[in-house]
Amino acid sequence: MSGIQFSPSSVPLRRVEEVQFGILSPEEIRSMSVAKIEFPETMDESGQRPRVGGLLDPRLGTIDRQFKCQTCGETMADCPGHFGHIELAKPVFHIGFLSKIKKILECVCWNCGKLKIDSSNPKFNDTQRYRDPKNRLNAVWNVCKTKMVCDTGLSAGSDNFDLSNPSANMGHGGCGAAQPTIRKDGLRLWGSWKRGKDESDLPEKRLLSPLEVHTIFTHISSEDLAHLGLNEQYARPDWMIITVLPVPPPSVRPSISVDGTSRGEDDLTHKLSDIIKANANVRRCEQEGAPAHIVSEYEQLLQFHVATYMDNEIAGQPQALQKSGRPLKSIRARLKGKEGRLRGNLMGKRVDFSARTVITGDPNLSLDELGVPRSIAKTLTYPETVTPYNIYQLQELVRNGPDEHPGAKYIIRDTGERIDLRYHKRAGDIPLRYGWRVERHIRDGDVVIFNRQPSLHKMSMMGHRIRVMPYSTFRLNLSVTSPYNADFDGDEMNMHVPQSEETRAEIQEITMVPKQIVSPQSNKPVMGIVQDTLAGVRKFSLRDNFLTRNAVMNIMLWVPDWDGILPPPVILKPKVLWTGKQILSLIIPKGINLIRDDDKQSLSNPTDSGMLIENGEIIYGVVDKKTVGASQGGLVHTIWKEKGPEICKGFFNGIQRVVNYWLLHNGFSIGIGDTIADADTMKEVTRTVKEARRQVAECIQDAQHNRLKPEPGMTLRESFEAKVSRILNQARDNAGRSAEHSLKDSNNVKQMVAAGSKGSFINISQMSACVGQQIVEGKRIPFGFKYRTLPHFPKDDDSPESRGFIENSYLRGLTPQEFFFHAMAGREGLIDTAVKTAETGYIQRRLVKAMEDVMVRYDGTVRNAMGDIIQFAYGEDGLDATLVEYQVFDSLRLSTKQFEKKYRIDLMEDRSLSLYMENSIENDSSVQDLLDEEYTQLVADRELLCKFIFPKGDARWPLPVNVQRIIQNALQIFHLEAKKPTDLLPSDIINGLNELIAKLTIFRGSDRITRDVQNNATLLFQILLRSKFAVKRVIMEYRLNKVAFEWIMGEVEARFQQAVVSPGEMVGTLAAQSIGEPATQMTLNTFHYAGVSSKNVTLGVPRLKEILNVAKNIKTPSLTIYLMPWIAANMDLAKNVQTQIEHTTLSTVTSATEIHYDPDPQDTVIEEDKDFVEAFFAIPDEEVEENLYKQSPWLLRLELDRAKMLDKKLSMSDVAGKIAESFERDLFTIWSEDNADKLIIRCRIIRDDDRKAEDDDNMIEEDVFLKTIEGHMLESISLRGVPNITRVYMMEHKIVRQIEDGTFERADEWVLETDGINLTEAMTVEGVDATRTYSNSFVEILQILGIEATRSALLKELRNVIEFDGSYVNYRHLALLCDVMTSRGHLMAITRHGINRAETGALMRCSFEETVEILMDAAASGEKDDCKGISENIMLGQLAPMGTGAFDIYLDQDMLMNYSLGTAVPTLAGSGMGTSQLPEGAGTPYERSPMVDSGFVGSPDAAAFSPLVQGGSEGREGFGDYGLLGAASPYKGVQSPGYTSPFSSAMSPGYGLTSPSYSPSSPGYSTSPAYMPSSPSYSPTSPSYSPTSPSYSPTSPSYSPTSPSYSATSPSYSPTSPSYSPTSPSYSPTSPSYSPTSPSYSPTSPSYSPTSPSYSPTSPSYSPTSPSYSPTSPSYSPTSPSYSPTSPSYSPTSPSYSPTSPSYSPTSPSYSPTSPSYSPTSPSYSPTSPSYSPTSPSYSPTSPSYSPTSPS
């Protein structure tokens, strides 16, 4: 597996903390060089040995096995290669720095090297404010480039002018030289100087040689370098000019020998040889004194070779070619691009320990298993270190060798030496030593990462457990294919084997499939039941599906963890039958409740629609995709949230196995018969299609006879098309519906559609009824040639069949024309998909690169690698998206009256409350005050919701902790009866709730910002809690008692804390994936608005690209203009505003323009106009009369369109007035009145006084001039409206608003939508509601309303695009993207122009795009990269500071010292003590005394590496796999006294692995009698213990550390307590009383049973052989046959005993579990002595005086 074996390096490895960029100085190049290269040849004369001083000089390192390196003396494998150098005869420009060289030249005086400006210039001081050196250089350059002279201080001729010390001179102190303007031409720089005062002279122009530039740069002073943003230490400007060229070692430009004689050299070697030759030519010419132009030519050649050696893709330069004509691969080409060094070899590499093959489905594997072919299992290995615990196993594997499956391939000794077992003669005899490593084959149960490309989201790589199987494909469970987006038509997938325990731990704890069931993308499951299991489970759960006894018995075999009890049959006579629902109920875990009403009906549901599951029993409903699919709030989601990932996995496995077994015997197949509808239906279909054709024909007739009215905002053609499409789609749907109704329910296609496993209504209608209209580019099939679609049809045929309507079904078959049209539509789909894949792939990459380093920090904020705050709280609530789900705010939908009825309590008037309560609270004014206060708060909450948070009345929002479910669970667990009054007081409820709210912390801290953020984050959840736990609801609706209420409070707090996002979570990448993944599902095309088809809106991928690129000019810019309420309600008023806004130019209303020669201004040659011209001049006007002679004889005549004038509500005087306004006195205008036959405007030019009318020469110009005026008038004279807004459409929008009584109602309002944008002016139009008006170009919003408005506009636009096709992405991902784009105060595009202009590290930027340019820039400004980002650490091969790498581990050295003493090498390896299976309830591994060394029991992964070990943590198929690890096992030292998780199935709906541990001192648990998570006085031998009793919990109130069966997980036991110590005198592993071999304790003794829930090896009264014993039987009692835990007559000590009775006491008469003075935290509580208290200062597990056995 491993490539070349390098000998281990002796160099100590350290972490790269930062990377400094810079330019190599000539001195450095010479000093690190080992050889001066002078000859272009590689080999000496013999052709066998490398030539000294040649390009393969032996000092540079060897690439030949025969030679050793002359510098370091190593062989080819170990010599890293050494640099040489070439001394250039003349300096040359470095091509990467050429533009920078030009900039610097323009900043300094080219004569004395001084900066052209200094601090006397105010602009200069501004430039020095830039922190970033690159920006500073640009700023200085902008100021300097215009200065054309170097200012002097004192004139150079004066006596005290000091040449040696320029800074001593006053003023600027320059040299006064004129500065050239510099032009770059190819690889050369030209300077041109202005010649003195005489402007007529041409400027002097000459070439600036690199040598001159080099000289200037050496003169620049240190201060000036700093001002210029250059770095004196790492990147002086004179080093940008190459004087010495480094020669890379041969190992980076290896040559290949062809047939032993000739060698093929690398491109770089060829290039270097060209440089050496050119260099020699320049040197020769110089020595010979050749003419200047020849030397210059050779210098240019040298410059060209050096430039193309580095970059062979210079614009405007010929490429350097190989002899074959292939361009050479330059250094730049090696680095850039996808295949280049950075992206191809550093950011992503090919890896070892991976396998790839085809995948196949296997429903019998567990959800997280992966079937691996045996050949792969024998090839891939895992290095396991030899320890006392596995030495025998590993020895066995070594014995098996590399060819037998569970074997081993290599042994690695502690010296690092590898033994290959394939070639070792007696491999089996090698004795293993501790500390050696064995590379063993992978075997069942190993975890691996499985992946399918393209990896679009984190569920594309998940952890699986392997199972080695025969044959050559990977096998995986069907349900896991959906997140991978895999199918079994030949897909291949990759498997990666982790190579360290740390990696395996991360895979197990973070990436395992069950943990990925619910995705953060849309907070819903990504896996559900699919395919045949889904079709089967629907059939299986139908009401009329019965099973016989035999069938049920066989099925029971497949039910996981079946307890051996059959559910009672539903039918007893004539024969015993069970239903499928009963069997499914066995698989659903107990404690799961689900309700879904499809149609609001009574509970006795005749149609069996909807779904009701109570306590894991299906009451009614058919199980289909809605229930067991990957749906929000479905069964999978509920089980995962309530019971944890492992149980959820068990549910998947169980349902698949049971249903597939049943389906195997029941059968389900589909044939062509299932698509055939009956004859009547076919007649109906034919009739429907005929009718549609008739309607279309009618439509065509209407259009041809001009009877069709165009719809608003559409042309006639568009209206016609829209109408035809409507008719045809209607026809297809109707035909399909009739076909669907005719198919029976037993029809197999219909069954699949009903189950949701495959197919939809449209598939049925296309197969059986009619395929329907084919669409290309959103329209019907267009006319391709000569006005028709195909030669089969007449010209201009618009009939359905000609334009692509297919009236046949797939069953009947398509005609050739139909087939052709169908192929057209299909082809479009394929092309679309192909184009879309490339586009979205690039979008995804850009998103990830823009957000890869955004992470949740340990202070709860979201920051990027530079530590800039992006969000104060992740998603503004600081929660993990996987752990939130949609919840409804009850108070929002109620009317004010209903609200009052539900929440208000008035003790004086309403007496009903007291009926529900034990204690009377009537007439208690303090209680009433509390209640009033609560009600005021609830009203305020409701106000806030209605006004600000959900003004549209949508009452659903994703929130943590499903409160409703917790209440339901409580009602079940505590068996609360509706009739019993409660012992809760209103004050208890209100105080309990307030305490809970105070504990919901996401941020700890008391400063103002923290408090604000904390309050904002939890506000919605607080409102939800207050509305759910209002006093009236708790007492009257849920009827909770005190215990239940306190349990609920504790549960809510615990679950809320789990829902808080983990620090180190890489939320940026998650957000990028959550947006990129739906983008791949998006359709590329833009769609039309329904109804108004000319209102085109860009959607889908093109719109997403516009948003991410922050495009200035978007395809369809549009404003949504909302109107004032009174206008929005009235169509006519809205129409007025529309005309106000729509931009109307003169050309819009003009129907014709003419130019006439009409010399007499007072009369006219045009007959039509005579009347109004005469009428105009009939009334004399002195001013007009005076100026008559100035009027031009040429006349411009405009004719206006009356219909348009009326539509736009314009009058003639309006139009003429605008013209006059525009031209003022230069144009003379007269016009006809508004009701004349024709609307005419006549214009003449008024000439200046000096141009008299007789001047004929100007006549010619005048008509031409008039023509230009005409064009100008039509376009630029704006009659009314807002510029840029070309069209305005009126739309009716549905809005939701709150009305008087507090409910929400739907209403319509008129809204204007525009083509074109101009937000500023549109907002000022009268009647426009400026607060709601919106532009879809957020670039415009940024300019007008600022960055915060832009952020919400951006969010809205993103939402529109993603939710258009029904995807849902959780708010926090979109919000994070918007915040990243706007957090810098300007819009950062998700392109190289945005991402690469941020201040992130150079390495990170160069891994995105513009690789070489960024590295050059970094070098030139001497940047430093602090390696905080993700990309940098990936390149350097280091653990990046993210996730599990975001923190360090703090190790308690002393504890370690004490601990290691007890480790004894186990002797009983594998003596029959396998991992015992305990029932979920038993938290204690009862079968061993705490002092025995645990030996080989239980796999380490069972005791998960944290104090949270608890029932069912790591089991297979939902059993608890208890790692029974004894005293000295390394996994047990972590149990601190306050840390026992109370979760286990006896009590709480238990949370599985992710549960935080409650501390016993949590007030929410203190007074519950049945819930003493860690009270230290319970003994399992006490007669009151019963596994099924409601008050029993493995962690229950009476557990005693001194009892013989006391276990290591007990809170008071801690290995660090001094009295327990392997060296303490009272403990001895060999003492006779504690020995595995002692007679009283033996694993094989008849009294030992690891599965018994209450087994204690020393209890005399318990025996598994006792006749009445059955652990699951409710009436089981170890001592008495009549014992029943719930019967009041049972009593261990007294006749009146009842477990909840206040006088019941295990130890003393005055002890009462519910009495307020009893609490594990109360100081007076003590199990053994009055002075004991867990929180008292004297109690501490590590305190020397504390001992579990000492009395105090």
Swiss-Prot record:
<dbReference type="GO" id="GO:0030643">
    <property type="term" value="P:intracellular phosphate ion homeostasis"/>
</dbReference>
<keyword id="KW-0597">Phosphoprotein</keyword>
<keyword id="KW-0808">Transferase</keyword>
<feature type="repeat" description="3">
    <location>
        <begin position="1585"/>
        <end position="1591"/>
    </location>
</feature>
<feature type="binding site">
    <location>
        <position position="491"/>
    </location>
    <ligand>
        <name>Mg(2+) 1</name>
    </ligand>
</feature>
<feature type="repeat" description="5">
    <location>
        <begin position="1599"/>
        <end position="1605"/>
    </location>
</feature>
<dbReference type="InterPro" id="IPR007066">
    <property type="entry name" value="RNA_pol_Rpb1_3"/>
</dbReference>
<dbReference type="GO" id="GO:0140463">
    <property type="term" value="F:chromatin-protein adaptor activity"/>
</dbReference>
<dbReference type="Pfam" id="PF04998">
    <property type="entry name" value="RNA_pol_Rpb1_5"/>
</dbReference>
<keyword id="KW-0832">Ubl conjugation</keyword>
<feature type="repeat" description="16">
    <location>
        <begin position="1676"/>
        <end position="1682"/>
    </location>
</feature>
<protein>
    <recommendedName>
        <fullName>DNA-directed RNA polymerase II subunit rpb1</fullName>
        <ecNumber>2.7.7.6</ecNumber>
    </recommendedName>
</protein>
<keyword id="KW-0548">Nucleotidyltransferase</keyword>
<feature type="repeat" description="22">
    <location>
        <begin position="1718"/>
        <end position="1724"/>
    </location>
</feature>
<dbReference type="GO" id="GO:0005634">
    <property type="term" value="C:nucleus"/>
</dbReference>
<dbReference type="InterPro" id="IPR038120">
    <property type="entry name" value="Rpb1_funnel_sf"/>
</dbReference>
<dbReference type="InterPro" id="IPR000684">
    <property type="entry name" value="RNA_pol_II_repeat_euk"/>
</dbReference>
<dbReference type="GO" id="GO:0006370">
    <property type="term" value="P:7-methylguanosine mRNA capping"/>
</dbReference>
<feature type="region of interest" description="C-terminal domain (CTD); 26 X 7 AA approximate tandem repeats of Y-S-P-[TS]-S-P-S">
    <location>
        <begin position="1558"/>
        <end position="1752"/>
    </location>
</feature>
<feature type="binding site">
    <location>
        <position position="175"/>
    </location>
    <ligand>
        <name>Zn(2+) 2</name>
    </ligand>
</feature>
<dbReference type="Pfam" id="PF05000">
    <property type="entry name" value="RNA_pol_Rpb1_4"/>
</dbReference>
<dbReference type="InterPro" id="IPR000722">
    <property type="entry name" value="RNA_pol_asu"/>
</dbReference>
<feature type="binding site">
    <location>
        <position position="72"/>
    </location>
    <ligand>
        <name>Zn(2+) 1</name>
    </ligand>
</feature>
<feature type="region of interest" description="Disordered">
    <location>
        <begin position="1554"/>
        <end position="1752"/>
    </location>
</feature>
<feature type="binding site">
    <location>
        <position position="109"/>
    </location>
    <ligand>
        <name>Zn(2+) 2</name>
    </ligand>
</feature>
<keyword id="KW-0862">Zinc</keyword>
<dbReference type="InterPro" id="IPR007081">
    <property type="entry name" value="RNA_pol_Rpb1_5"/>
</dbReference>
<feature type="repeat" description="15">
    <location>
        <begin position="1669"/>
        <end position="1675"/>
    </location>
</feature>
<feature type="repeat" description="18">
    <location>
        <begin position="1690"/>
        <end position="1696"/>
    </location>
</feature>
<dbReference type="InterPro" id="IPR006592">
    <property type="entry name" value="RNA_pol_N"/>
</dbReference>
<feature type="cross-link" description="Glycyl lysine isopeptide (Lys-Gly) (interchain with G-Cter in ubiquitin)">
    <location>
        <position position="1252"/>
    </location>
</feature>
<keyword id="KW-0238">DNA-binding</keyword>
<dbReference type="GO" id="GO:0006368">
    <property type="term" value="P:transcription elongation by RNA polymerase II"/>
</dbReference>
<feature type="repeat" description="23">
    <location>
        <begin position="1725"/>
        <end position="1731"/>
    </location>
</feature>
<dbReference type="GO" id="GO:0006367">
    <property type="term" value="P:transcription initiation at RNA polymerase II promoter"/>
</dbReference>
<dbReference type="InterPro" id="IPR007080">
    <property type="entry name" value="RNA_pol_Rpb1_1"/>
</dbReference>
<feature type="binding site">
    <location>
        <position position="112"/>
    </location>
    <ligand>
        <name>Zn(2+) 2</name>
    </ligand>
</feature>
<feature type="repeat" description="1">
    <location>
        <begin position="1558"/>
        <end position="1564"/>
    </location>
</feature>
<comment type="function">
    <text>DNA-dependent RNA polymerase catalyzes the transcription of DNA into RNA using the four ribonucleoside triphosphates as substrates. Largest and catalytic component of RNA polymerase II which synthesizes mRNA precursors and many functional non-coding RNAs. Forms the polymerase active center together with the second largest subunit. Pol II is the central component of the basal RNA polymerase II transcription machinery. It is composed of mobile elements that move relative to each other.</text>
</comment>
<feature type="repeat" description="20">
    <location>
        <begin position="1704"/>
        <end position="1710"/>
    </location>
</feature>
<feature type="modified residue" description="Phosphotyrosine">
    <location>
        <position position="1531"/>
    </location>
</feature>
<feature type="binding site">
    <location>
        <position position="69"/>
    </location>
    <ligand>
        <name>Zn(2+) 1</name>
    </ligand>
</feature>
